[in-house]
């Protein structure tokens, strides 16, 4: 089954447009009952295969709703319709299944159909899915004796559930309803997650439905808490809690608290301790697993990826037997069901009613507290939080349910806002406040969305401080502009009754054109001044005005009707996205995304002598400094600990803040003292998590590798490039601004975007103008003040100093808010300027130096700047976005790879490669947009045709390949980038820096930790049933900014195959086989279809492919010339072996393969036909020695060392000739066909070395190594010339090599390490390696580390040095490592193959597939390597990988 990127990304917006199932599927019998319909057994008409068909009643056309405008595509709007809530849930579930069902733990989705019935009968929606014959986990538990599953079964099922959740979480989907009923099992014990009706809410733009969702007994406490406190939020870890409850359900037959009523259970879950299993007979690992899953504070709860590393699910002993026993149990259940006539996939009526009731929690009948504010912007897709143009994936009716809910709440006068006093009464201003025009203009420069807030008297006093002041440059004044007077929610309520309703899904301007620079005084000056001088009407704007300015009902406080009639409220017009988050959450100060580019309320010093407002020329720098003064004061007031000490008296701003907090302007259910204690505990917890010592053991810095001068140069270059980009694309950005009406988004998206928490130390602000002095001062190495932040209006825009005494302009560069390691105080002085020179806030989302609890969402942290005269003590990522990463073994790629994507514009820009930063890097998180996985093509220097986002971001932010920080290891939780914290940027070490490459990654390959390499993250998975994809960079392309590897065929960005569907490849890493069997007719790849079929209309996409994948005879049309000659190629042979392939060896051009029961010959010269040579004998290891006309094997049940004559095998192949049959019989009689050597039994491994016409064979037996020497008429081939005892060590693998002194050396590995024996002196020595590593030597079965050395390159010192290099590269020994003639290192572990340059250890290519249980190295010759993969159903397939570039091989090796 193909991965995402083709039909999966096309949203179903109209059910009536779905095809009719007639002639494709037919229904047989009802096998179950679902929430919205019945489940039938379906039959595919052509093939007769069985499927599950979910049949639901639906309307062809939705219900009309006059005046509702909906999105039908991303360019236009029209009067539209809406479906019912049930149909809407079905449609969004359908779309989710289309996108994400390619994972092996997600139920396979075959398609949706709309069945038209005759009049009088309702039409039907058919959702065709994989048939899970065993039913749900709940059904299996109920039909199991004692209603309890075995612990091993629970571990296996929990692991599969976590893998599926990790896949969903990587695509920003929270399932929210994980329970036994929603986890199905197939007949062969495959685990499938179903029911995405609730999880579809996470991909919507409205936040109101993201709060209280799920089934009560499985619901996480933080989800329940959102009902009581809408300011609380939760993230993907709520699913982990549900996994823990499901584990208890499997262990005890029912979830905890199941005897209580649902609402009672909610209260108990929220207030009581986490549940535990009642019986004490479960293992400690299981109990600890459940404890970790059900940590009540979700900030400390591991993610699904972390839980996969838990020993309970990670170290399942005898997994094959566990699966076999579970399969046998499920088979018995299926048979029992068939006898009793119980439905196959039954979902009980109680469960259906329960889900129906639970879904009602989301309806309009829920309390207003549930709907008044979105619980968390983290529960919405990342693309809508940033500057991405509208997406066609948004359903046309998504805004309608929330509009309906709002209207009902408004009619009931029950709209609550975070901005109200604790007694829920609104205090009004006695008179109208005059607001300076530049105050309103500042708020309108970039953000037209304003909130008109009726404020208490304390705010009225504060508003006087915000009145007009003269600018410091003494600009000419303009006529006074009165502040708009509005009645807030009441006025908008009237507008709703009298006017056509506005679309609540309007996307604000800054979300469309976020990539543009803030308005410059010379760009659009006339239009901006016109906005300033035009007073805002008291009533909401007319229809011809921008809808963003009209729809502010979510951000206004509706006072009681009587007070509205009595007096007219006084309004302070503020920026919605800043002030509301600041004032609504008094426990945290939240700075929204892109704050440094949103000009808000300029606050100047109060001047009583200037009664009138001064004209403001929209200079960004002046607005920012004053706004950040307000934010600084708010932050200091709100985050100040109870014992905080302020050395200077409070100024007007501080008094303003004190009044705000003491007047109860913020909603806070707890007393003030309790609030402060919570703040103190919060700060203490964050400080504890950010302690440097927590990272010391995981991230060891090599600061000597940092080249700060290069970073400074790149920063300046990036600054210049940004100016050019913005100037050249001014017209395009203006068009985006004019098209704002074509975009839609909730207004709550405006001010509840992903936010970063800033903790600011209480201190007095420095006078304006001290910015330069502050920046030049060295930063103290103090963990309480490890950050300096700088606010600036734009990226790369020069901001004049706020003090006239300093006329020169101080260039401000964004500084990442990520924590820094204080390893060397002198380094900070050297970094005084460069330490704040991080990338643009558009793309620099990910924090490498994340605390140990960092999550996928941490990349959404913003880059902000410190205003003049302000210090920021400690800045941390939002604590609710944090999550523990367990060492560098964390499955980071699951959460990082697919989250940072550049949004593809309408056409590839012709600007510099850094133009990618204009388009939000996080916008394509779901992979729905037509996006290239590579950066945009740079026609001038061709520097960014990369297949990896890391270099896209590096280029967009001016990073040089040689100026990157040394990334020492794959520590996810560590602190990795003092001044170079890139999003997933994993920069190579010094050796790589010298080569000018920026694609190395030193990390844990064995744990799949992938960070910033430019190859591996591109493709870690396989498409469809048997594909495999590699990431590669091809040729090294140099450019003016430093050498970077680029994809060989990445130049053709205009090609639809290369440009439009590139985003599908990173998601292959989560793709696995959808069925248990991989057959040749089920292979479908984005590159080449393996079964000879066409690609079903999908374009051939190879831009990011380093290893193009094809059949054994790839078609030339599928591969460009660059790929064919410059990129390693992987061939997958279509033959599917029913048993595991253990070994292989090349015989001429053909390949001999040994399996558990047979010896095969694969004819590679023709059509890859398979010939069975020897039957009913297992082969553990084989090697062809053509000089001796022998095939040496370890075979048989007793693992004997046997030799077969190649001539005899050749005669078996040519057995059609009668003469050959006679020769075979004669050879059998003379024992020339096959004979055992020295009667050895229990052989583990052997190695063959040919040296000076002598063939040496070393055989590892139980406690010794036998050395044979075969030469023409010199030695007795049946007797070992030497036997080397290995003391108490059991040899696992053995290898032979000739040392530097032409002495024969035997290398072998054991469970205790790596050992060397001198064949002449018989002295055994050990090679120093980590104690926990088992080293496997060359030409082994691929069970450990293998060294494949040429005869002339094997000396003890060289091997020791080699092993050290391997350890440096991988940080953990992979399954095997080989040096090939192409001067590359190829390492493979259980599920991945890596190819690195031998000289620089740069990762060049990688293969990774989740559907492969093992990757077993077979043999190699020249640039070709053969592997065997063990699939999920224990079948095997053979891969041929061509490593080298042909021109290099021809030149160097005459291949």
Swiss-Prot record:
Q: Where is this region: Disordered?
A: 385-404, 471-568, 760-854, 1029-1080
Please indicate if the UniProt record lists 4Fe-4S as a keyword.
Answer: no
| Sequence ranges assigned to domain Protein kinase in this UniProt record | 25-313
Give an example GO biological process. Answer: regulation of spongiotrophoblast cell proliferation
User: What class does this enzyme belong to in the EC scheme?
Assistant: transferase
One Pfam family linked to the record = CNH
> Do you know which InterPro entries this protein is assigned to?
CNH_dom (IPR001180), Kinase-like_dom_sf (IPR011009), Prot_kinase_dom (IPR000719), Protein_kinase_ATP_BS (IPR017441), Ser/Thr_kinase_AS (IPR008271), STE20_Ser-Thr_kinase (IPR051700)
SS bond list: none
Compositionally biased residues, Low complexity: 520-531, 1029-1038
Which residue ranges does the record assign to the CNH domain? Answer: 1138-1425
- The Acidic residues compositionally biased stretches are 540-568
Q: Coiled-coil region(s) at which residues?
A: 716-750
User: Which PANTHER family does the record cross-reference, listed alphabetically?
Assistant: MISSHAPEN LIKE KINASE 1 (PTHR47096), NIK-RELATED PROTEIN KINASE (PTHR47096:SF2)
For this entry, the protein name equals Nik-related protein kinase
Highest classification ranks of the organism: Eukaryota, Metazoa, Chordata, Craniata, Vertebrata
């Amino acid at each position: 089954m193909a991965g995402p990127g083709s039909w999966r990304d096309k949203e179903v917006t109209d059910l009536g447009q779905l095809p009719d199932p007639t002639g494709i599927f037919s229904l047989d019998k009802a096998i179950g009952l679902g929430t919205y319909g019945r489940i039938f057994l379906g039959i595919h008409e052509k093939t007769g295969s069985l499927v599950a068909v979910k049949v639901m009643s639906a309307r062809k056309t939705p219900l009309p709703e006059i005046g509702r405008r909906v999105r039908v595509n991303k360019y236009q709007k029209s009067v539209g319709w809406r479906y019912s809530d049930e149909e809407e849930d079905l449609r969004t579930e359908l779309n989710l299944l289309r996108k994400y069902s390619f994972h092996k733990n997600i139920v396979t989705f075959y398609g949706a159909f709309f069945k038209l019935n005759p009049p009088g009968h309702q039409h039907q929606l058919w959702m065709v899915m994989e048939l899970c014959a065993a039913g749900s986990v709940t059904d299996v538990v109920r039909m199991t004796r004692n209603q309890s599953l075995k612990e091993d079964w629970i571990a296996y099922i929990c692991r599969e559930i976590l893998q599926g959740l990790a896949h969903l979480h990587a695509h920003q989907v929270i399932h929210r309803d994980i329970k036994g009923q929603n986890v199905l099992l197939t007949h062969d014990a495959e685990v499938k997650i179903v029911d995405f009706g609730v999880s579809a809410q996470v991909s919507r733009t409205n936040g109101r439905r993201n709060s209280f969702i799920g089934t009560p007994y499985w619901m996480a406490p933080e989800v329940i808490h959102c009902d009581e406190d809408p300011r609380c939020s939760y993230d993907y870890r709520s699913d982990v809690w549900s996994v823990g409850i499901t584990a208890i359900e499997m262990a005890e037959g029912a979830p905890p608290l199941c005897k209580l009523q649902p609402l009672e259970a909610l209260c108990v879950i929220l207030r009581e301790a986490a549940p535990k299993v009642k019986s004490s007979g479960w293992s400690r690992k299981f109990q600890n697993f459940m404890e970790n899953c059900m940590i009540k504070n979700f900030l400390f709860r591991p993610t699904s990826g972390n839980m996969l590393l838990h020993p309970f699910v990670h170290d399942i002993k005898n997994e094959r037997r566990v699966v076999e026993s579970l399969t046998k149990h499920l088979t018995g259940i299926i048979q029992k069901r068939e006898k009793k006539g119980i439905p196959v996939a039954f979902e009980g009526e109680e469960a259906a009613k329960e889900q129906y009731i639970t879904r009602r929690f989301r309806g309009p009948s829920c309390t207003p507290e549930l709907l008044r504010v979105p619980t968390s912007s983290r529960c919405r897709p990342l693309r809508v939080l940033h500057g991405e143009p509208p997406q066609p994936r948004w359903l046309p009716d998504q805004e309608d349910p929330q509009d309906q809910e709002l209207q009902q709440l408004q009619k009931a006068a029950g709209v609550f806002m975070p901005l109200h006093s604790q007694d829920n009464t609104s205090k009004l201003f006695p008179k109208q406040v005059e607001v300076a025009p530049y105050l309103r203009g500042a708020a309108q420069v970039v953000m037209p969305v304003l909130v008109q807030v009726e404020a208490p008297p304390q705010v009225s006093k504060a508003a006087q401080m915000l009145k007009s002041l003269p600018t410091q440059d003494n600009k000419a004044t303009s006529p006074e502009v009165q502040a708009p007077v509005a009645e807030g929610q009441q006025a908008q309520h009237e507008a709703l009754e009298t006017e056509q309703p506005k679309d609540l899904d309007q996307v604000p301007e800054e979300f469309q054109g976020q990539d543009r620079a803030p308005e410059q005084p010379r760009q659009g000056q006339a239009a901006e001044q016109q906005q300033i001088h035009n007073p805002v009407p008291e009533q909401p704007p007319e229809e011809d005005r921008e809808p963003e300015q009209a729809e502010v009902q979510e951000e206004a406080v509706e006072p009681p009707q009587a007070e509205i009639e009595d007096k007219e409220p006084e309004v302070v017009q503020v920026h919605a996205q800043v002030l509301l988050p600041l004032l609504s959450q008094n426990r945290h100060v939240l700075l929204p995304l892109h704050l440094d580019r949103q000009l808000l309320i300029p606050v100047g010093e109060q001047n009583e002598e200037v009664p009138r407002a001064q004209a403001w020329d929209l200079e960004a720098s002046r607005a920012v400094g004053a706004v950040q003064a307000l934010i600084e004061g708010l932050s200091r007031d709100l985050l100040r600990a109870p014992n905080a000490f302020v050395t200077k008296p409070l100024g007007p701003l501080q008094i303003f803040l004190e009044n705000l907090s003491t007047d109860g302007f913020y909603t806070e259910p707890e007393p003030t003292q309790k609030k402060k204690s919570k703040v103190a505990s919060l700060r203490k917890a964050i400080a504890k998590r950010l302690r440097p010592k927590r990272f010391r053991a995981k991230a060891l810095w090599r600061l000597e590798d940092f080249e700060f001068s290069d970073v400074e140069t790149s920063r300046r270059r990036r600054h210049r490039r940004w100016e050019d980009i913005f100037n050249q694309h001014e017209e395009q950005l203006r068009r985006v601004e004019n098209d704002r009406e074509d975009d839609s988004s909730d207004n709550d998206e405006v001010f509840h975007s992903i936010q970063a928490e800033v903790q600011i130390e209480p201190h007095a602000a420095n006078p304006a103008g001290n910015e330069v002095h502050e920046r030049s001062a060295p930063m103290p190495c103090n963990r309480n003040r490890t950050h300096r932040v700088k606010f600036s209006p734009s990226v790369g825009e020069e901001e004049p100093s706020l003090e006239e005494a300093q006329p020169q302009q101080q260039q401000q560069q964004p500084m990442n808010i990520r924590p820094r390691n204080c390893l060397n105080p002198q380094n900070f002085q050297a970094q005084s300027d460069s330490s704040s020179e991080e990338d643009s806030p558009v793309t620099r989302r990910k924090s490498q130096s994340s605390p140990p609890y960092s999550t996928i969402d941490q990349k959404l942290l913003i880059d902000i700047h410190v205003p003049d005269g302000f210090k920021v003590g400690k800045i941390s990522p939002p604590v609710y976005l944090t999550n523990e990463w367990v060492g560098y073994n964390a499955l980071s790629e699951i959460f990082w790879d697919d989250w940072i994507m550049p949004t593809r514009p309408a056409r590839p820009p012709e600007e510099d490669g850094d133009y990618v930063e204009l388009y939000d890097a996080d916008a394509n998180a779901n992979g729905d947009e037509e996006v290239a996985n590579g950066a945009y093509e740079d026609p001038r220097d061709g520097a960014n045709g990369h297949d990896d986002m890391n270099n896209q971001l590096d280029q967009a932010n001016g990073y040089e390949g040689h100026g990157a920080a040394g990334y020492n290891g794959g520590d996810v939780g560590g602190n990795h980038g003092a001044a170079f914290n890139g999003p997933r940027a994993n920069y190579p070490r010094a050796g790589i820096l010298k080569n000018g490459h920026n694609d190395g990654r030193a990390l844990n390959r064995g744990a799949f930790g992938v960070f910033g390499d430019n190859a591996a993250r591109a493709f870690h998975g396989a498409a469809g049933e048997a594909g495999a994809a590699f990431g590669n960079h091809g040729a090294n392309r140099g450019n003016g900014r430093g050498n970077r590897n680029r994809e060989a065929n990445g130049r053709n960005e205009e090609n639809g195959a290369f440009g439009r569907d590139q985003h599908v490849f990173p998601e292959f890493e989560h793709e696995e086989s959808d069925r248990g069997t991989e057959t040749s007719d089920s292979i479908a790849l984005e590159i080449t279809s393996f079964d000879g079929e066409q690609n079903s209309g999908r374009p051939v996409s190879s831009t990011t492919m380093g290893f193009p994948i094809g059949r054994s005879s790839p078609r030339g049309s599928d591969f460009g010339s660059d790929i064919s000659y410059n990129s390693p190629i992987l061939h997958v042979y279509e033959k599917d072996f029913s048993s595991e392939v253990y070994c292989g060896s090349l015989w001429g051009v053909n390949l001999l393969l040994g399996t558990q029961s047979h010896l095969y010959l694969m004819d590679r010269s023709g059509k890859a036909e398979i010939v069975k040579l020897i039957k009913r004998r297992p082969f553990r290891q084989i090697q062809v020695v053509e000089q001796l006309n022998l095939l040496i094997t370890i075979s048989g049940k007793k693992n004997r060392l046997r030799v077969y004559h190649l001539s005899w095998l050749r005669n078996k192949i040519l057995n059609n000739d009668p003469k050959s049959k006679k020769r075979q019989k004669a050879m059998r009689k003379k024992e020339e066909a096959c004979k055992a050597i020295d009667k050895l039994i229990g052989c583990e491994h052997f190695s063959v070395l040919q040296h000076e016409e002598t063939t040496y064979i070393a055989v590892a037996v139980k406690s010794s190594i036998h050395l044979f020497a075969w030469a023409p008429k010199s030695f007795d081939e049946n007797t070992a010339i030497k036997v080397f005892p290995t003391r108490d060590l059991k040899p696992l693998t053995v290898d032979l090599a000739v040392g530097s002194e032409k002495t024969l050396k035997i290398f072998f590995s054991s469970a205790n390490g790596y050992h060397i024996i001198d064949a002449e002196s018989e002295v055994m020595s050990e090679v120093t390696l980590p104690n926990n590593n088992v080293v496997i030597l060359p030409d082994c079965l691929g069970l450990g580390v293998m060294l494949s050395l040429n005869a002339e390159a094997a000396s003890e010192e060289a091997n020791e040095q080699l092993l050290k290099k391997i350890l440096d590269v991988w940080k953990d020994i992979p399954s095997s490592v080989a040096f090939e003639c192409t001067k590359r290192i190829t390492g493979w572990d259980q599920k991945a193959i890596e190819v690195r340059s031998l000289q620089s250890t740069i990762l060049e290519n990688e293969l990774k597939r989740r559907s492969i249980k093992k990757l077993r190295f077979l043999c190699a010759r020249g640039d070709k390597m053969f592997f065997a993969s063990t699939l999920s159903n224990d079948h095997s397939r053979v891969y041929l990988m061509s490593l080298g570039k042909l021109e290099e091989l021809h030149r160097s090796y005459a291949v």
